[in-house]
């Protein structure tokens, strides 16, 4: 990652675009597919780099910035549930200095003279949920989703053995929030069952819990050893408690499971002592934790602190450092991806790290292998922090044997044997044989049918491989004629190994259903290099319809300067992406495929709906000293209500809130005839909204 201090504005703009797309992909994999692509540590590093860039260049903040989003958008297979109170995620801190900064911000924001108690509790590594009770009866269970809309998992949540379906002495409306998880021993047993049944093993307990809870068939969920803790309230008709410690006691009284390991800290020293205690003893806990959550204990103070776009100001998560292990590197294999990129993968002597057996690790790229001087036969250090593919962080040179061998990058593609070329700006080696490369063609079809693209359920990795091997499909277009081909064949698909009448029938129904596709999904399904989910929405919004999109792409391919500039001006599309788009539409086979697909698909025009709040778009200015509010708290409240807070008064200003010694801004507001109110009127306005 580049040095943030030395980066210039143009470099920052490009990097922010790349980060937005990459983080969006990682969010979807983690929150929706329950298959994380990177470690927690790597994700946190990317997210914090994005934050630092935005702090340095605030005018470059993108509309699709990760700092504005929570989780990922929900899938269509579950009914949607709107969270009346958004389910925000927590910001992260990584060392004592970060924690001290967090505590200082609380003091400054609230103008406190002394330390306000902080409640500390373990950060369970599971799946967040919300459960709503009406008159004591459980009516709705939902996932976090994107923080605003989650998935309805009511039937599944009811299968958890000790989850209350009814609570006594409850308010008319109560929404509790917490974490669903699987204990370490249960996870080991579950993976043994998966292996015995010939199914894929779960990467870690968090993935197992998430995958279990998001089953379409509740009877499958019922067989999984799910447990839960509640730790927060979403909404209630009456106040249950005045503080976090009181709330947990109330939850316990109502019959919910709460984590008994928690501490009310009255000083920084007590906070750090509790963190060290949990870090040292987490291996003895029956469940996985990945840090400690710190919350301002007093709810009245929490309300004053409020929220930023994706997280509360009054709480944060102090993450544990990654777990390190050591094992032998047996070999290095090479994988060819959808866009031709070759990725080296370390094959390892199996080792248990944090309760998970690890036998493979990512090596990222060949430059990384050379930089770390990783050799086959070495004993390597592994880092794992809840990720599906751990990372090699270094080599134990003291254990290096004389026969440890360096790994030379291949000169020819292991799939199609075509000559490879090095792409220095991306630090990668690539095969440019496109659809003529079996590995790329396979991965491209896999991408085309994936959840975020055409979403054809029943075409997983094994099924796609089978259909290609049998010559039933050779490109995405063939999928839509699979039923006709099967009907004309002497050997029916349902009679082949791994298939049955019902699975084939469901597959054909899903293929038919996928023919109605939105423009963003269609563009994403094409698999254009560097063009992710967020970018396709920008393109779809710009062009509106498939016909216009294709017409504009033809102009772009012909180097039309007007369309090139129009796309380059889009907030989220960079030069590198434009080159990749041009390269894609310059390939004859791609144009033919798109034309063929357009004849069998109904590609729907792009439609966007935006929700407006009562103050959305209003420009307000605070000036002078407020009697009770800090400037930060006043600004936060305004932004929470949808207003934009400006630093100066202009003819575009809608409202000025003036305190003592307001000065020139107040004078200008009077001259322009802008509405002016004081702090008391502002607080009344806020309360009424």
Curated annotation (Swiss-Prot):
Cofactor or coenzyme needed: Mg(2+); Mn(2+)
Q: Which Pfam families match?
A: BRCT, DNA_ligase_aden, DNA_ligase_OB, DNA_ligase_ZBD, HHH_2
GO MF annotation list: DNA ligase (NAD+) activity; metal ion binding
Where does the chain cross the membrane?
Answer: none
Source domain of life: Bacteria
Query: What is catalyzed by this enzyme?
Result: NAD(+) + (deoxyribonucleotide)n-3'-hydroxyl + 5'-phospho-(deoxyribonucleotide)m = (deoxyribonucleotide)n+m + AMP + beta-nicotinamide D-nucleotide
- One biological-process term from Gene Ontology? DNA replication
For this UniProt record, give its keywords in alphabetical order, as a comma-separated list.
DNA damage, DNA repair, DNA replication, Ligase, Magnesium, Manganese, Metal-binding, NAD, Zinc
Gene Ontology cellular component? cytosol
Q: Which CDD domains match?
A: BRCT_DNA_ligase_like, LIGANc
The active site of this protein is located at 123
E.C. number: 6.5.1.2
The chain positions of domain BRCT read: 610-689
What residues does Zn(2+) bind to? 413, 416, 431, 437
The UniProt record gives the binding positions of NAD(+) as: 40-44, 89-90, 121, 144, 179, 295, 319
NCBIfam families assigned: dnlj (TIGR00575), PRK07956.1 (NF005932)
Q: What does this protein do?
A: DNA ligase that catalyzes the formation of phosphodiester linkages between 5'-phosphoryl and 3'-hydroxyl groups in double-stranded DNA using NAD as a coenzyme and as the energy source for the reaction. It is essential for DNA replication and repair of damaged DNA.
Q: Please report which protein family the annotation says this sequence is part of.
A: Belongs to the NAD-dependent DNA ligase family. LigA subfamily.
Name the record gives this protein: DNA ligase
Organism field: Rickettsia bellii (strain OSU 85-389)
